[in-house]
Amino acid sequence: MAATAELIPAGEVIACHTVEDWNNKLKAAKESNKLIVIDFTAVWCPPCRFIAPIFVELAKKHLDVVFFKVDVDELATVAKEFDVQAMPTFVYMKGEEKLDKVVGAAKEEIEAKLLKHSQVAAA
């Protein structure tokens, strides 16, 4: 269990820089049975830079949710796997199931879907 906690620390946005790192951390997150929110981002994307600190605050507030940040240029294969067409894209999942998606830096929508799916995840 300690290994899982180390791979997916609560209260943080977990950045993955290699496919191997991503696969290991996503596997641990899926096994934790927590809601997972993935922010697909890019360094050159102004809306991504706008929403990044808000995403960090959400991670600090929702300790029962696993938050990931994936740079689409670094991990293009992962972005393709999740059918990311625009940045930022937020994907919500639990276990193997993709629950929802938000495209764009829509703070209210991101928070609303986070609350909706974290309540379902807790049930």
Swiss-Prot record:
GO terms for cellular component: cytoplasm. Disulfide bonds join C45-C48. Residues 2-119 form the Thioredoxin domain. Pfam families: Thioredoxin. It is found in: Cytoplasm. SUPFAM superfamilies: Thioredoxin-like. InterPro entries: Thioredoxin-like_sf, Thioredoxin_CS, Thioredoxin_domain, Thioredoxin_H-type-like. Coiled coil: none annotated. PANTHER family: THIOREDOXIN, THIOREDOXIN H3. Participates in various redox reactions through the reversible oxidation of the active center dithiol to a disulfide. The H form is known to activate a number of cytosolic enzymes. Belongs to the thioredoxin family. Plant H-type subfamily. This is Thioredoxin H-type. It comes from Brassica campestris (Field mustard). The gene is PEC-2.
